[in-house]
Amino acid sequence: MPLKLSKELGFVIPLVRVRDEIALGPFTYRILIDGVVLGEDEVFPDDCLALEAGPIDTPVPGRVVKDPSFGLPACWIAPEERDLATASGYTVVDAATVIGTHLNHILGQQSHLLLGQDEVQALLDTLAAAHPQLVAGLVPKLLPLATVTTVLQRLLEEGVPIRDLRRTISSLAAVAARTQDPAELVRIGLGGAIVQTRCSLREPLMAISFASDLEDLLTQAVRASGSGAYPFDPALGGRVGEAVRAAAAPLIAAGTRFAVVTTPLLRRPLWGLLNA
């Protein structure tokens, strides 16, 4: 799984280390990155997990839980109930698959935590072998390695792969000299790639946008806060979050891909608000 994820994201995911932890319960596992617990749950090696991924004809008895990766309703069942559960509409997996899927999900969501300056330097060295002037013209001429690392981490944090590194570095070089926030403007040159993370080439991408008066109000809040991490009044932020969730609910229910569209100034603060 880490190898497949490495290809999808564009950098090598470090090896996963597995060790016993006597302080945990007999069926409990934890997933940590840099000593921080990012996931924890229980698995029962002798049983199977039946996931309610769609309509269920006949519920099967078992230990009721939530799927650790996506929060789907599920239950642990005896292996002899597997065929019955599958026939009833459940998706049935073994304990190893549960842990592997949970690990892959966390690595995908938190991949930015795994990319540091050493990893970025290795990526740039590889790119420089084919495009030496591109790399030399950016680092350290226009931006230090630390800033390039921050930009790539930001992209990964927001679900944008960096596997097309030449395009990413080219876009970064194009905006580096005219902005104090290259992590935001680099997205302009990556627009097509970003859209394709949400939908296929021929699939329409639905958009949620803000009324102009609300956008003006939010813009004023961001400008007044300077570089504040939380620029919005809690009451206003709460109302905006509720409104976006209400607009998104029918799209999510229909399985329709969508994007929230706003100005470059508001995009990152709103991303933080909606993902809090």
Predicted regions and their residues:
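Membrane-embedded alpha-helical signal segments
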Residues: 1-276
